[in-house]
Amino acid sequence: MNDQRKGSDAEPTTHFGYKNVPESQKAEKVAEVFHSVAAKYDLMNDLLSGGMHRLWKRFAIELSGVRTGNRVLDIAGGTGDLTRKFSNLVGPTGQVVLADINASMLKVGRDRLLDLGVSGNVEFVQADAEKLPFPDNHFDCVTIAFGLRNVTHKEDALRSMLRVLKPGGRLLVLEFSKPTNKLMSKAYDAYSFAFMPLMGKLVTNDSESYRYLAESIRMHPNQETLKSMMVDAGFDRVTYHNMTAGVVALHRGIKP
């Protein structure tokens, strides 16, 4: 559980990075972070991952099983990397919905994809992952890439994703996770808490947002815990694949 109670009448709290904040404030604080970083989000992704995020996303697409005519939901779709690829895969008879709770990220994604000529089979929706505004049994595939760690009630979000999937539909969760060896873990800590905020300061003049992003990664459930959460939410055949020594993990579950 993410929340904590300090007394019977106290509002539940949850983590915002390493800080505990009232649950009602987390979404607003996360929104402020992504309003701040939206304009240079793609540039920072390339700089901070050395371009590796493109390989991680490519692997997710390969495991998605998406094909012509499918309906895909890309949650926390941000600037549209996955949506662009899925748009090509589903073709004119399919549909991709790019959903993001953050209006700034959604605008950047819409503008970027329109500039690239991606339209026709793509819809943009501002939506909360915990309360997805879509019918039951609607999508063949749901993805959430580097977004689940920012969700306040992850269990609610996973159940919401299960609800909108068709039976046999796939959920893919691509997220930063826990390195699988001590050497990588130490190097990753140094990188996250020194280099990431420094680059944030130099490129976006915002070190605090990138400090939060580093902290949010550490507070995210590890590979086995997230697998158990997906099973508890109702997913079947849940597996995960570690990438870059566990820095990133791709979880996949099927709706029974």
UniProtKB/Swiss-Prot annotation:
Methyltransferase recorded as keyword: yes
Entries under InterPro entries matching the protein: SAM-dependent_MTases_sf, UbiE/COQ5_MeTrFase, UbiE/COQ5_MeTrFase_CS
Membrane-spanning segments: none
Catalysed transformations (reactions): a 2-demethylmenaquinol + S-adenosyl-L-methionine = a menaquinol + S-adenosyl-L-homocysteine + H(+); a 2-methoxy-6-(all-trans-polyprenyl)benzene-1,4-diol + S-adenosyl-L-methionine = a 5-methoxy-2-methyl-3-(all-trans-polyprenyl)benzene-1,4-diol + S-adenosyl-L-homocysteine + H(+)
Pathway this chain belongs to: Quinol/quinone metabolism; menaquinone biosynthesis; menaquinol from 1,4-dihydroxy-2-naphthoate: step 2/2; Cofactor biosynthesis; ubiquinone biosynthesis
Assigned keywords, A-Z: Menaquinone biosynthesis, Methyltransferase, S-adenosyl-L-methionine, Transferase, Ubiquinone biosynthesis
Disulphide linkage map: none
Binding site for S-adenosyl-L-methionine: 79, 100, 128-129
GO BP terms, alphabetized: aerobic respiration; menaquinone biosynthetic process; methylation
EC number(s) on file: 2.1.1.163, 2.1.1.201
GO molecular function list: 2-methoxy-6-polyprenyl-1,4-benzoquinol methyltransferase activity; demethylmenaquinone methyltransferase activity
Keyword Nucleus in annotation: no
Family per record: Belongs to the class I-like SAM-binding methyltransferase superfamily. MenG/UbiE family.
NCBIfam families to which the protein is assigned, alphabetical: MenG_MenH_UbiE (TIGR01934), PRK00216.1-1 (NF001240), PRK00216.1-5 (NF001244)
Job of this protein: Methyltransferase required for the conversion of demethylmenaquinol (DMKH2) to menaquinol (MKH2) and the conversion of 2-polyprenyl-6-methoxy-1,4-benzoquinol (DDMQH2) to 2-polyprenyl-3-methyl-6-methoxy-1,4-benzoquinol (DMQH2).
Protein name stated in the entry: Ubiquinone/menaquinone biosynthesis C-methyltransferase UbiE
Gene: ubiE
